[in-house]
Amino acid sequence: MPKPIEWNEFDSGMGSKLDVSSSLNSSSSNMDRDRSESPKRHVNGSNSLKRGLHFDGEHTERDPHLGNGQKYTQQERRVYVGNLSYQVRWFELKEFMGQVGNVLNCEILNLPNGLSKGCAIIEYSTAEEARTAIKTLSNQKFMGRLVYIREDREQNARFGSSSVSPSASSNGKDSEPDRQLFVGNLPYNVRWQDLKDLFRQAGSVIRADIQMNQEGRSRGIGIVVMSSMKEAMHAIQMLHNTDFMGRTLEVRLDRFAHHKSKPYSTHGNGYTFPAEMQMTTSSTYLPMLGANTQVEDLVYHAYPHGPCSDCIYVGNLPWATSDRNLLDLFTDIGSVIRARIAYEPTGRSKGFGVVQFENENDAASSIEKLNGYRYGGRPLQLSYAHYATPLPAVPTVLSGLPSVAYTPPVMHIPTTNSPLTPQSFTNSFLGYLPISMPVANMPAIAPISVALPENNIEHSLEPS
C-alpha cells in the first residue's frame, strides 16, 4: 500500500478562474446511489429531476470531452470519494485528486441546508486515471481523515450547472463565499479601517468588518472579503500566524460563509426534516456528541444565563442544526467533551443545544468569540448553562474499604391493644446496647428502669 499522504494545505495557484459548464437537461436516473436524491427543479419549463447537489463553492469546470450532443459524462471516468472532512473545499479536493490525473469535474455533495455530506464525485479525463485514483489514493489521509474511493455507480450522472450562482456564471467572478476570510485573535482596539489596510497588502479588499458584542466592544474577530479567490488564498499565506499589534493572527476561509445565504423555513407549526438531513455519525464521535443516556440532563434541564462553568447554552440555532454541526462549530474554539441538540418528542429541534468543554476557559472563550455570530442566517445566543437542580455528580468509589450496610434502629412502642411482653422488649432494646467491657476500678452500674406511660409496667434491665 502506498505511504499515507497528509494534506492540510493547498497551493495558491488553485485560485485560477474556472470555466462554468452549460446547463444540461435530462430525465432522472433510478440507479441506486450512496447519496440522497436531489430535489426537483424546473428547467426550461419542464419539471425534471435534476441533481440539486452542487459544488461547495458553486463552481464547475467544463468537460472538454462533452460535445454539444453528449449530455452525460462517462461512468468509467468517475469515482466516488467518501469520508471527507466536512470543511474541505472543492479546490482542495481537486488538488488532492489531481495527483494521479487530470481532474475535469470536482463536485462536493451538500445537504439542502448547505452543509457538506462528506462525500464527492470526481471525474477524470480518462478511465485509466480513475482506476489509478482508486488504487493509489484510497485509504490515504486527507485533512485528517482516511478517505475511501470507489467507482461511481450511477450510469447517467452528469455535472449540472443549475446550482452555479448567477454572479459566477454571468460576470465570471468568484462567488463571495470563496473570497470571504475569517480573521481571529485580533487586538480589541483594531478598527475595521485598520483591518482593511492590513489586508490590502494581499490584494483588493471589498469589505472588512469587526464583530462586536452587545455592548459595542470588539470580540477580537473579523470578516474580510477579497476581490478574488486567488487574492484570498494569497492573504492566508501572507498573514496567517503573523504578528499584528502584538497578537498572532488566525486567517482562514470562513467555513460558514455558504450557510449565511441558505434559508431555513418552517411549514405550519413544525419543521419537517427531509431524509437527506438524517446524518449518520461514526462511532468515533459518539462520546463527543453525547450519545448516551447520562447526558440527557445536560441538555433537557439546561437554561440560559447561568453561573460560570464549563457548559454553555447555545440558543437561536437553525432548526436544521445537528449534533455534528454543533460539535464542528465549537471544535476550533476549545476542547469539547460533548455537544448536544435538544429535540421535541416528535423529533423537531427545540432550537438550542448545550456544549460542554474540558475547562471554563474554553467555555468563556467560545462565548466571547461566537456570541452574536450569524450561523445559518441567525445570530447565536451564547451564555453559561443554568440548571434548576444540580447535575448528578459522578459516583466515587473508595478503594480498600469494605462496604458496610447500616440499618437504623427501630423501637416498637406498645399500645393497649398490642401489649409488648417484658422479654420481647428487653431483647429488642438490648440489640442496640453496646457490649460492656471489663474496666478496672469501675463502679457497679445500677439497674436501668424503663417506665411505659400507657400501662405503667416497669421492666428491669440488667446490664450483661
UniProtKB/Swiss-Prot annotation:
What's the protein called, per UniProt? Answer: Serine/arginine (SR)-type shuttling mRNA binding protein
| Comp. bias regions, Low complexity | 16-30, 161-170
InterPro entries the UniProt entry points to: Nucleotide-bd_a/b_plait_sf, RBD_domain_sf, RRM_dom, RRT5_SRSF_SR
Give compartment(s). Answer: Cytoplasm; Nucleus
Q: What is the lineage of its organism?
A: Eukaryota, Fungi, Dikarya, Ascomycota, Taphrinomycotina
Record carries keyword Metal-binding: no
| Gene Ontology cellular component list | cytoplasm; cytosol; nucleus; protein aggregate center; ribonucleoprotein complex
Which residue ranges does the record assign to the RRM domain? 77-154, 179-256, 310-387
Q: Name one GO biological process term.
A: poly(A)+ mRNA export from nucleus
- Which positions make up the signal peptide? none
